[in-house]
């Protein structure tokens, strides 16, 4: 019997380079075959240049998040612990520029869509409904599912209470 293929997914790193190192070491020790990151590398108390070096060193497949986009376009620099392009090395800037909004990775024999929000919309969210926020149909998610490339995705949801 073939060994199970294990995918580790991390996100919202926010330049926490020390915690990132601990997390990656933990995942590797758990036998994770491939690690992917859903973005938001920027804007945190840690060192973004070091964060990028760690991701590259560990060959982490990464996409951009909204904070990464904001950093590159000089938007929302008022957020707490915002990074600024002028304080980063060129390798970090080039790396952030190279990150796609979405990426399809092969996980074992299955394609997996990696993104920060929903598809190329890095601020889109999906979560179960509550009385204050009912589940809403997402035409963008429907489009992704209708493409048929990700057979594990389903739009079936339940809004009933137990």
Model-derived segments and their meaning:
Residues 2, 27-32, 107-108, 147-149:
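Glycine-rich phosphate-binding loop signature in dinucleotide/nucleotide-binding domains
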Residues 4-98:
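Core catalytic region of metal-dependent phosphoesterases/phosphodiesterases
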Residues 83-98, 102-162:
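Acidic, His/Gly-enriched loop-helix segments that form or flank divalent-metal centers
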């Amino acid at each position: 019997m073939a060994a199970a293929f294990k995918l580790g997914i991390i996100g919202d790193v926010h330049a926490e380079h020390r915690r990132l190192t601990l997390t990656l070491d933990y995942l590797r020790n758990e036998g994770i075959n491939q690690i992917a990151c859903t973005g938001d590398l920027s804007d945190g108390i840690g060192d973004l240049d070091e964060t990028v070096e760690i991701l590259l060193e560990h060959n982490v497949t990464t996409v951009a998040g909204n904070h990464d986009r904001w950093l590159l376009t000089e938007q929302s620099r008022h957020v707490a612990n915002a990074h600024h392009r002028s304080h980063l090395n060129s390798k970090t800037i080039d790396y952030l520029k190279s990150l796609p909004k979405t990426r399809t990775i092969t996980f074992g024999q299955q394609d997996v869509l990696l993104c920060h929000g929903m598809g190329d919309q890095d601020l889109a969210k999906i979560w179960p409904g509550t009385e204050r926020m009912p589940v809403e149909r997402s035409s963008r998610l429907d489009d992704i599912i209708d493409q048929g490339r990700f057979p594990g995705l389903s739009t079936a949801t339940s809004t009933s209470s137990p």
